[in-house]
Amino acid sequence: MNLAVQDVVKRPLITEKAERAREANRQYAFEVHRDATKIQVKQAVEKLFNVHVLDVRTAIARGKNKRVGRNVGRRPNWKKAYVTLKEGDTIALFEGT
């Protein structure tokens, strides 16, 4: 699927697990478009944040079942990507500056 660069990365994931991965292994977590490939994620992160990406690992997270009263629905499945950066590169968005 042909996606624009700004459509590939949806938002950063700021969780405790993602913070541990960032501090220990220079891995940054993002929610990405469900149809995006690892190559598209790599190109998008490099272009948007001006960094050098070494590795991309992706996983599809299952949507949770949700209830509102008697009605039962389901949130959609979504994809997350852990991106490993070159030594010395950082993304200011995650650093809180």
Swiss-Prot record:
GO terms for molecular function: rRNA binding; structural constituent of ribosome. Belongs to the universal ribosomal protein uL23 family. This is Large ribosomal subunit protein uL23. The gene is rplW. Keywords: Ribonucleoprotein, Ribosomal protein, RNA-binding, rRNA-binding. Part of the 50S ribosomal subunit. Contacts protein L29, and trigger factor when it is bound to the ribosome. GO terms for cellular component: ribonucleoprotein complex; ribosome. Transmembrane segments: none annotated. The keyword Protein transport does not apply. InterPro entries: Nucleotide-bd_a/b_plait_sf, Ribosomal_uL23-like, Ribosomal_uL23/eL15/eS24_sf, Ribosomal_uL23_CS. One of its GO terms (biological process) is translation. PROSITE patterns: RIBOSOMAL_L23. SUPFAM superfamilies: Ribosomal proteins S24e, L23 and L15e. It comes from Anaeromyxobacter sp. (strain K). One of the early assembly proteins it binds 23S rRNA. One of the proteins that surrounds the polypeptide exit tunnel on the outside of the ribosome. Forms the main docking site for trigger factor binding to the ribosome. HAMAP family: Ribosomal_uL23_B. It comes from the Bacteria.
